[in-house]
Amino acid sequence: MVRPTRNRKPINYSQFEDSGNDSDDDFISSSTPVNKSKTVPKVLKQDKPKPNLKNLQKEEVLPTEPPKKRVALDDKVFQRGLEVALALSVKELPTLTNQVKKSKEKSTDKQGKEKTENTGKPPRVSNCSVASDDVEDLDKITEEGDASSVEGERKSPSQAKAPRRRAPSEGSDGSSANDTESESATGEGSESDPDFDESKESDEDFGVRRSKESKKKTVQKKPAGEKKERKSKPKCEASVTSVDPAPAAIKSGSPSLPQAVGLPSEATRKPAIMCSPSAESKRPKWVPPAASGSRNSSSNALAGTPAKSPSQSLRLGLSRLAPVKRLHPSATSSQVR
C-alpha cells in the first residue's frame, strides 16, 4: 500500500527574531549569508594555540617530585653528630701531621749526635796483643793437636778389635777368661791417648756388644764333656769365681771400665744356662687328678696303669651322644711313655 504524502507547512523564523536573543546560533535569521556562519568557527579554531607534541612528551617524562618525608628526631641527631665528627677530624689532621714531623726531626737529631760521639771516641784496644811470631807458634800448636786427635781416632777401632779377637780364645774356666779380660782392659787404658776421651763411650759400647755375641757363640759350641763338668759345680762357686775379678777391674781406673764391670754379669748367666738341663730332669712328671687327694693310699698300686684324662667325663653343656674333643690329648701319650 502506498502511503499518503504529508502536508508540510513552511515556517517563518522572522517572527522569532524580536522575541528571542541572537546569542544562539540555532536561531539565525534566514537573511544572513551562510558563509559567515562557516567562517566564524574557523577563526576561533585558529586563535587557539596548538599544543606541541614535544612539549607534551617532556612534561610526561619529567618525574613528579615526591613529597618530602619527615625525618625522625633520632636520625636528625645522628646526622648532626656525624657532621660534627667530620669537622673535628678535618681540624685534627694538620695537628697530627705536625706532631709526626717533629718526632722525625728529633729522631734524626739523636742519630746525628750518636754518630758524632762514636767518631770522637778512640778505637778500643784488646788486652791480649799477639806478635807475628806468637801467631806462628799458635798455628803449629793447633796443627799438632789436630794430628794427635786423628791418630787417637785411628787407634780407637784397632783397640775395639782387640777384645773381639781375644773373646774366642778364652778357656773353659770363667775365672781365667775374666782375668785375661781385666788385664787387657788395663793395658788398653795405659796405651790410650787423652784425645781418645771424645769417642771413648761409643767404642766401648760397641766392643761390649760384640764381646757378648762372641761369648754366646762359644758357649753353644763347647763340647758335652765341659757341660758335664759345669753340672757338677754348684751355682754358688760359679757366682763367686765370676764376681772375683770385678774389684781388680775397678781398681785399675782404666777408661774401659764398662767392659770389666759388664763381664761378671755375663759369667753368672753361663752356669745358669748350663745347669738348666739338670733342673728340667728333676721336674716331677704330670700326675692326673684321680691319683691325688683322698686316693694317695691307692696311688702306688695304680701307678703302673695308664690313667684316663678327665675330659672324658665332662659334658660342657652338650648332649650325651655328641662327640667331645679332649682338652689334653698329649697327657695320655706322656703317661704311657
Swiss-Prot record:
**What one GO molecular function would you report for this record?**
DNA secondary structure binding
InterPro entries given for it?
Answer: HR_DNA-Binding_Protein (IPR052003), RAD51_interact (IPR031419)
Post-translational modifications reported in the UniProt record: Sumoylation with SUMO2/3 by NSMCE2/MMS21 promotes stabilization, possibly by preventing ubiquitination.
Compartments where found: Chromosome; Nucleus; Chromosome, Telomere
Q: In which tissues is it expressed?
A: Most abundantly expressed in testis. Also expressed in spleen, thymus and bone marrow. Not detected in heart, kidney or liver.
Residue ranges, compositional bias (Polar residues): 28-38
Biased composition (Low complexity) is annotated at: 290-304
Compositional bias ranges of the Acidic residues kind:
190-205
Q: Where is this motif: SIM motif?
A: 138-143
* Region annotation Disordered: where it falls in the sequence: 1-69, 88-337
Interaction with DNA: annotated segments: 32-50, 225-286
Query: What's the domain of life for this entry?
Result: Eukaryota
Q: Name one GO biological process term.
A: DNA repair
**What stretch of residues is annotated with the motif WVPP motif?**
286-289
Q: Which UniProt keywords apply?
A: Chromosome, DNA damage, DNA recombination, DNA repair, DNA-binding, Isopeptide bond, Meiosis, Nucleus, Phosphoprotein, RNA-binding, Telomere, Ubl conjugation
Q: Where is this cross-link: Glycyl lysine isopeptide (Lys-Gly) (interchain with G-Cter in SUMO?
A: K251
A Pfam family reported for this protein in Swiss-Prot or TrEMBL:
RAD51_interact
Cellular component GO terms held in the UniProt record: chromosome; chromosome, telomeric region; nucleus
Tell me where the cross-link Glycyl lysine isopeptide (Lys-Gly) (interchain with G-Cter in ubiquitin is found: K251
User: Which positions does the record annotate as the modified residue Phosphoserine?
Assistant: S19, S23, S103, S107, S309
Q: What does this protein do?
A: Structure-specific DNA-binding protein involved in DNA repair by promoting RAD51-mediated homologous recombination. Acts by stimulating D-Loop formation by RAD51: specifically enhances joint molecule formation through its structure-specific DNA interaction and its interaction with RAD51. Binds single-stranded DNA (ssDNA), double-stranded DNA (dsDNA) and secondary DNA structures, such as D-loop structures: has a strong preference for branched-DNA structures that are obligatory intermediates during joint molecule formation.
What is this protein's record name? RAD51-associated protein 1
* UniProt source species: Mus musculus
The top of its lineage is: Eukaryota, Metazoa, Chordata, Craniata, Vertebrata
Q: Which gene encodes it?
A: Rad51ap1
